[in-house]
């Protein structure tokens, strides 16, 4: 459960990043106290040499994320709507359809964390939908 690392494996001193859930759809952890559940698909521990330090730069409008999206969504548009708190627009553009596979972020030459912004926007849209349903 909560403290798997000390009980089941030993981290070396050069471990700098821990990702729970796998390399594509996983979430970086900030400490070792994150719970590991039955549904946790993997734990990835990276050293400094394995972590790319590529800073985020402005969007180039190259369209690589759009071409990579298996659902033919427009990740840059969805992420931008999330950044601007335009959740109605995000909903209208199909943000809830996104399966959060991460291919958009992986292919982005500007290193924009598209899937993280989309995930945030999707949570907000789902919350709005739930509130609308509760009001009726």
Role assignments for model-derived ranges:
Residues 1-110, 115-127, 131-136:
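Redox cofactor-anchoring modules in respiratory/redox and cofactor-processing assemblies
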């Amino acid at each position: 459960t909560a403290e798997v690392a000390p009980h089941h494996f030993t981290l070396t001193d050069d471990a700098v990043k821990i990702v729970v859930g796998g390399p594509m759809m996983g979430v970086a952890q900030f400490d070792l106290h994150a719970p590991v559940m039955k549904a946790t698909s993997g734990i990835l521990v990276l050293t400094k040499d394995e972590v790319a330090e590529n800073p985020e730069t402005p969007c180039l409008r190259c369209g690589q994320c759009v071409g990579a999206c298996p659902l033919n969504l427009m990740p840059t548009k969805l992420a931008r709507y999330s950044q601007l708190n335009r959740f109605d627009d995000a909903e209208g553009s199909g943000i809830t359809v996104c399966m959060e596979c991460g291919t958009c972020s992986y292919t982005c030459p500007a290193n924009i964390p598209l899937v993280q912004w989309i995930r945030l926007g999707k949570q907000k849209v789902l919350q709005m939908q739930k509130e609308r349903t509760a009001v009726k």
